[in-house]
Amino acid sequence: MSSISIWTERWFLSTNAKDIGVLYLIFALFSGLLGTAFSVLIRMELSGPGVQYIADNQLYNAIITAHAILMIFFMVMPALIGGFGNFLLPLLVGGPDMAFPRLNNISFWLLPPSLLLLVFSACIEGGAGTGWTIYPPLSGVQSHSGPSVDLAIFALHLSGVSSLLGSINFITTIVNMRTPGIRLHKLALFGWAVVITAVLLLLSLPVLAGAITMLLTDRNFNTSFFETAGGGDPILFQHLFWFFGHPEVYILIIPGFGIISTTISAYSNKSVFGYIGMVYAMMSIGILGFIVWSHHMYTVGLDVDTRAYFTAATLIIAVPTGIKIFSWLATCYGGSIRLTPSMLFALGFVFMFTIGGLSGVVLANASLDIAFHDTYYVVAHFHYVLSMGAVFAMFSGWYHWVPKILGLNYNMVLSKAQFWLLFIGVNLTFFPQHFLGLQGMPRRISDYPDAFSGWNLISSFGSIVSVVASWLFLYIVYIQLVQGEYAGRYPWSIPQFYTDSLRALLNRSYPSLEWSISSPPKPHSFVSLPLQSSSFFLSFFRLSSYGEQKEISGRQN
């Protein structure tokens, strides 16, 4: 068998969860770079009043649509759920692979054609200038007569099918493939985050599929679901879309919660504070996420009682979110904190997610949101939660687990520099947008009065700093692959804290199962079923011995 056919079979016909996870991460990196390029175009256009680079407002809106859909469906979800989820979940539960390995492969390979459809949609005719929300009548056939919106709908359908298949796989794996000793209440928090996310996807995506299919038939088959002339109602689309759209933002952030819990615990050198509380907080956030969707729609003419209910329900979400924030702070408190790149990103996440949550409390109030709706205040709010929440969680997870994924260490100094560059860049970009929103600058408009030019210039400068940080990240990955030194099984262990006691040594060494196997893991991770004892968190399996642990920790020193 030739090396080319072996390579093709490994990467194109793979049924190995670890290889598929790596494919997801590569795909997310590519999509993220594409989405970042679109975001820089937006910020360059807004760097000054009047026309800068993009004379056509339709093109500007098409860029905004492409940026949003790329970042949400093709960057954050494939990285956090597809990438880290696939690679780590079988290791965390002690299983050999995912429950349905071939289903896993098809759920990845649906994404590249979906991405192509989205890119075609942006390039054909004037592009889909609807925003990611694709509201009718703007997305209707009168306003967008070409095939752009249809292609965007097909792209969403394909990525939705991919996510649904992945969700079924994750739920089945967690329920059926846990090794003896890992009860649900001993599962790593990242495992809980993935299964909660999978349930949310399973419940919300069919609603989106129904809404965009109805829009497709309105556009092409003369139905009138959202056409007032035929007895339809465009507000129905908003209800259907946001019934999916609000759980979607929790789908994006809950895996991040799991990663941050893992990394803060690892680099504070103590267990997560309030494990059970953390699990139930994530569950509560997931459930409450389904009953608050109309807070996106305060300005469409909802009844005053309806607005009062959605304000109250939205504010209640702050309670489980606050539990998580304070539990992370309590985990840090009294711990032996090491400011590794992963820990820096985790602390950055906590800081900026808190700021995003505070502006969310403001927007939850119907009376205030009447003023803030569709201004840059909203843009600042959700970018603090996503651009600095989900993305910082991705980097935290990457720097924590990449020695396990690649088996190579990375440059600590450069990766800390990347954190500070990105931290400064995103704050410079999005903090001024709060002020622009308070002054009433509307979203999705490519021109603005001269009075807004100062804060916009600072915001655009911040986006350039963020892009430099992204280039630095690519360079860090490059030198890791070319010059990286071998990483042991658990490169984050602290040898000076070891005692002569075997139990203490092993307790220190492996906070969860994935660190008990080689770096990078073999295609079939566990030769025999690992056993998790109730007294300490460790897997015993063939080839594992005390001598090997001492040899590995000695090699790290």
Curated annotation (Swiss-Prot):
Residues the entry annotates as binding Fe(II)-heme a: 67, 383
InterPro entries according to UniProt: Cyt_c_oxase-like_su1_dom, Cyt_c_oxase-like_su1_sf, Cyt_C_Oxase_1, Cyt_c_Oxase_su1_BS, Cyt_c_oxase_su1_dom
Mitochondrial matrix side: 1-20, 94-102, 177-188, 269-274, 333-340, 406-411, 480-557
Binding residues for heme a3: 381
A single cellular component GO annotation: respiratory chain complex IV
EC number: 7.1.1.9
Record bears the keyword Nucleotide-binding: no
Cofactor detail note: Binds 2 heme A groups non-covalently per subunit. Binds a copper B center.
A single GO molecular function term of this UniProt record: cytochrome-c oxidase activity
Subunit text: Component of the cytochrome c oxidase (complex IV, CIV), a multisubunit enzyme composed of 11 subunits. The complex is composed of a catalytic core of 3 subunits Cox1, Cox2 and Cox3, encoded in the mitochondrial DNA, and 8 supernumerary subunits Cox4, Cox5a/Cox5, Cox6, Cox7, Cox8, Cox7a/Cox9, Cox6b/Cox12 and Cox6a/Cox13, which are encoded in the nuclear genome.
Biological role: Component of the cytochrome c oxidase, the last enzyme in the mitochondrial electron transport chain which drives oxidative phosphorylation. The respiratory chain contains 3 multisubunit complexes succinate dehydrogenase (complex II, CII), ubiquinol-cytochrome c oxidoreductase (cytochrome b-c1 complex, complex III, CIII) and cytochrome c oxidase (complex IV, CIV), that cooperate to transfer electrons derived from NADH and succinate to molecular oxygen, creating an electrochemical gradient over the inner membrane that drives transmembrane transport and the ATP synthase.
Designated name of the protein: Cytochrome c oxidase subunit 1
Organism: Neurospora crassa (strain ATCC 24698 / 74-OR23-1A / CBS 708.71 / DSM 1257 / FGSC 987)
Lineage: Eukaryota, Fungi, Dikarya, Ascomycota, Pezizomycotina
Gene name of the encoded protein: cox-1
